[in-house]
UniProtKB/Swiss-Prot annotation:
This is Sugar fermentation stimulation protein A. The keyword Transmembrane helix does not apply. The gene is sfsA. Keywords: DNA-binding. Binds to DNA non-specifically. Could be a regulatory factor involved in maltose metabolism. HAMAP family: SfsA (MF_00095). InterPro entries: SfsA, SfsA_C, SfsA_N. It comes from the Bacteria. It holds the Pfam family SfsA_N. CDD domains: SfsA-like_bacterial. Residues 201-220 bind DNA. GO terms for molecular function: DNA binding. Belongs to the SfsA family. The keyword Phosphoprotein does not apply.
Length: 234
């Protein structure tokens, strides 16, 4: 998926109030960007990092610029806009770039399901096959090439795992899909040191038939695409 129009570059001053970030452009202008990420953004928002941002043509927006990517001082590209995880996953499924999720004739988004009144990110369907329920998570936390999720305690994420276990118990296919949006990550594990309950539930989910997939995106200032399956260690 290509960025159109192309992203613009700036240098990060600070992220604050969760949804805002101040940057300096190459010509010395100071801008305030919308930050579309409610997470901790550990390692993704260091002062001096390069920020790549888009600009909306919607004149009613208070903050027309949106922070899309970080290019860390070590050179790693990180997608901080969490909306891209679902966009890239949908594109990869439709292009059949994810072999484990190929061969379906129908893709639906935001389908209501489950006892806890959730919405599944994607449901795949095909004749003579069980429905496939897919929950997508964005992975940007990295330590020594190891990717982790979550970057903060997530009761919502725990709920999604419980719902997927129920789906698998009903004979349908249940998949938790980790979209790795950090170019330095080479392998994935749950962040037990941050949310032990989530890590425990992920192991339980696998034992109960929930499939765990992790795919890494190729990221540049020109575009992104999910390309490579990564090893998962629980």
């Amino acid at each position: 998926m290509e960025f159109s129009p192309l992203l613009q570059r700036a240098t990060l001053i600070q992220r604050y109030k969760r949804f805002l970030a101040d940057v300096i452009t190459p010509d010395g202008r100071e801008l305030t960007l919308h930050c579309p990420n409610t997470g901790a953004m550990t390692g993704c928002a260091t002062r001096g990092d390069t920020v790549w941002y888009s600009t909306s043509d919607n004149t009613k927006r208070k903050y027309p610029h949106t922070w899309e990517l970080t290019q860390s001082q070590s050179g790693a590209f990180i997608c901080v806009n969490t909306l891209w995880a679902n966009r890239l996953t949908k594109e990869a499924i439709l292009n059949e770039s994810i072999s484990e999720l190929s061969g379906y004739s129908s893709l639906k988004s935001e389908v209501k399901y489950g006892a806890e009144r959730s919405r599944i990110d994607f449901m795949l369907q095909a004749d003579s096959r069980p429905d496939c329920y897919i929950e997508v998570k964005s992975v940007t936390l990295a330590e020594n090439e190891q990717g982790y999720f979550p970057d903060a305690v997530t009761e919502r994420g725990q709920k999604h795992l419980r719902e997927l276990m129920n789906v698998a118990a009903e004979g349908q296919r249940a998949v938790i899909f980790f979209a790795v949006l950090h170019s330095a990550i080479t392998r994935f594990s749950p962040a037990r040191h941050i949310d032990e309950k989530y890590a425990q539930l992920l192991s339980e989910a696998q034992q109960r038939g929930v499939e765990i997939l992790a795919y890494k995106a190729e990221i540049s200032a020109e575009g992104m695409a999910l390309k490579k399956s990564l090893p998962v260690t629980l």
